[in-house]
Amino acid sequence: MSCDNSAINGMNPGMAGFIVAKKRVMELNDSMQQGIVYLLGAGPGDPGLMTVRGRELVEAAEVLVYDALSSAELLNWAPAACERIFVGKRASRHALPQEEINALLVKLGRAGKKVVRLKGGDPYVFGRGGEEADALHEAGVPFEVIPGITSAIAGPAYAGIPVTHRKYCTQFTVFTGHEDVNKKESSLDLKGIAGAQGTKIMLMGMQKLADVCEALTGYGQEPSTPAAAIQW
């Protein structure tokens, strides 16, 4: 199907919008004829915060490789024939080790599948998307990264907390409270974080909250600093 702008301009707005949307879906299907893996950020859980591009990909997927998402509604967008594979992680409970997830994505991509790797938040914000992208690149499997809304921004926003404010805060720091347990040394610079200005956002840190707070105050963070613990 072809559809140029001059043809669209001569139509009523409703029909033009339908044709553009149809063309977009056909282009998506064409791009997915070859095996490809989409590393898709699902956002913080509210289905309404998924991007339009993300929903289009889920609706066209042949295989959905998904994490422990907050909303099962996202899975219902996939076609009935779509294969659904759960690889989620909760604290120390992993359905599959990360290395096996990487291998699975490579295998599915090489098999010519249209794979959507559905990840909570944003793939590249503590989502291990970088590791999966590395594995796909090294294996020569085509992939694309689709950003999602990170909970580092959405969580505070839903709680009524702006991470920046022109009068009070012109920078923010995001760090993890859950590092790789196989690391020989921590790469988390809590001393530097304590001395940094602006809002400080810790993700995946409820189990380490007391230890991190003690470390930050030990490095000079003012104990009276306003703080919030946001969990859903």
Regions found by a protein language model. Give the residues of each.
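Residue-identity detector for glycine
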Residues: G10, G14-G17
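Polybasic, lysine-rich low-complexity intrinsically disordered segments
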Residues: N12, K22-K23
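Class I S-adenosyl-L-methionine
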Residues: M26-P47, V52-I149, A154
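A contiguous loop/helix-start segment that scaffolds small-molecule binding in enzyme catalytic cores
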Residues: L28, Q34-L39, A111-V115, F175, ...
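Residue-level signal for well-ordered alpha-helical positions
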Residues: W77, Y158-A159, A215
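Short hydrophobic/aromatic-enriched beta-strand-loop microsegments
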Residues: C82-K89, G140-E144, V163-T173, G220-A229
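Class I SAM-dependent methyltransferase SAM-binding "motif I" and its flanking Rossmann-like core
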Residues: D122-A196
